Amino acid sequence: MPTRPGVDPGSRMNKRDLVIVTVMTLVYLAIALINLGSLEAPQTGWEPDRINESFVVDFGREVEIDRIFLFGGLGHAWGCFGTLEIMAWDGDEFVPYTFIDMKSIFRWLYTTDSVKTSKLLVRNTYLRAEKEEDRRYFKAEYREMAFFSGNELIRDFTVTDINSSQDVSLLFDEQDLVPDRPSFYYGTYFDEIYFPRTALEQIEKRSIIYENTHPPLGKTLLGIGIRVFGMNPFGWRIMGTLFGALMLPLMYLLGKRMFRDTFWAFFCTYLLMFDFMHFVQTRLATIDSYTAFFVMGTYLFMLDYYGAWAFERGFARSLVPLLLSGIFLGLGGATKWVALYSAFGLAVLFFASRVQEYIEYRRRLDAAIAQKKESPDSRGKLLRAYVLKYFVLTCLFCVLFFIIIPATIYTLSYLPIQDRNDGRNLVEEVIASIKHMYEYHKGVTEPHPYSSHWYEWPLMLRPMYYYSGPLMPEGMGSSIACLGNPLVWWTGFAAFLSMIWLLVTGRIKRILGPEESRRGWVPLVGYLSLYLPWVVAPRKLTFIYHYFSCVPFLILMIAAVMRYMEGIKLIGRRASYILMLSVLVLFILYYPVLSGLVAPRWYLNVLRILPRWDW
């Protein structure tokens, strides 16, 4: 049977493409690494075994203390929280002064209560907490403590054990690591209180892990940075940042496969490069970077399969992109369940491709018979052979690729935490974890000031406020907020609505051709597969960052609609350049609220252009 010559060479990467995407990735990475986090953090500390262990800090003179900093570590107890009660010497006795509650670790906590005294008595007590079940914790690891008089770090003092089973001097042995003020650069913020700690627990093979509401793979990947650079902010953020940078080559490949054009591949990558959420979310030590990366990968290979006829490639070669798509699906699901939503879209695209290809194969077969290149008697036999190989057998392989292999990857992702002393085998551990995670997410209903509903995300009606810098100079601020670049998200949502109309009415097919129209369904289906499940998801407390994996598909739809408008001469290439320039300008203007850069408070307020934008 005659076939068309090969796959469109325009979809292949050439030297020019490699240079472009390499430069873009390196430029982005250089920007993303600026002030990512400190390579140093306190490593030793005081870990009292009993309640009410205490020590005295003697300054040898009367000093005015107006700030006390405290950095907490993981210690050896799961409930590594507690409270330090601090009493001040008034000349006759120690009187109550202040408390520092350690409810989170690997960050600098502080009190600004002031006192004039020559000595302090510090005692560990049960954690002061609103919930009764939290008040039992006291086995904290206090890694470093510091005293300030004004902006000056007080260094001249002696420490005496009063009632302590551990070496208290370890609480004051890394004073050079004390920052002038606490900030994200020196410690955890937002959900980093969960994931880096859990990654360390997995590395140390702890019997109980802290964050158990998502599969382990994301924490395993995060832990690679900790293994290489240590338990410090740079160490726990670097892997997510690298995956964020690697999303750019994936975006370029998606654009290249989709449009067969270097400019549009560059255009798509550029928009992702300067999208706000991509920058913010991948610099945060959570697991969303890995999830979005794997979702992009699974759709890249499904696009590769969907965009070419399997019978032209040959049976064995046609299975390769399906295998790779399934592997990425498994990796995504082993990181965060939301990646599994993409399976709905993958199934739609796969079965649509089988129907479309059968129609195309039959059309070509009939043409070959009409040209007497095939015998009419062979028609039924050839069609049955096609269906057996390219539908039945391919579907059977898809059971392996999209069910068995992902399930295996998911199960194997639990190996790093299999050494826990709970008596369960690996499969039992996975099943118990799945039940626990489902019940947890179904039961998350407590209100949150920055939660938002699924229908608010495309218009960014309620961004997520991640970080507010404490102890800032008068009139200055430091903030990190999670939102999208307005020109990417708002234009993208308009492109999504336009794409539905253009595809359903066949306008893209008439202007850009049937192949581009066919591929145009990929970002639309991908977007809907990741977005619509949130309408019916059992989890009711949701946030705008749940929309992150949808962003690459919005960008592809922007490019598709602009290509169509160019095709009908409604706009020229200049419009794309103007959009790209405007996206960059907005990224620069909003950079302080994306990076935590200290800026005048009035400027940060000016950036709040919608009523519920708050930082």
Where are these regions (language model features)?
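Aromatic, loop-rich ligand-recognition surfaces of beta-strand-rich domains
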Residues: 33-187
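Short acidic/glycine- and proline-prone juxtamembrane loop motifs at membrane-interface regions
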Residues: 236, 240, 277-291, 338
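Short helix- or helix-capping micro-motifs
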Residues: 268-273, 300, 329, 333
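Aromatic-rich transmembrane-lumenal/periplasmic boundary elements in polytopic membrane proteins
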Residues: 152-200, 387, 406-456, 460, ...
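Membrane-interface transmembrane helices that cradle and orient dolichyl/undecaprenyl
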Residues: 298-321, 332, 351-360
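Transmembrane-helix signature of polytopic, membrane-embedded enzymes
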Residues: 251-274, 293, 312-320
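Transmembrane helical bundles and short interhelical boundary loops of multi-pass, membrane-embedded
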Residues: 2-20, 30-57, 75, 90, ...
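Transmembrane-helix motifs of polytopic, lipid-linked glycan transferases
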Residues: 234, 238-259, 297-301, 501, ...
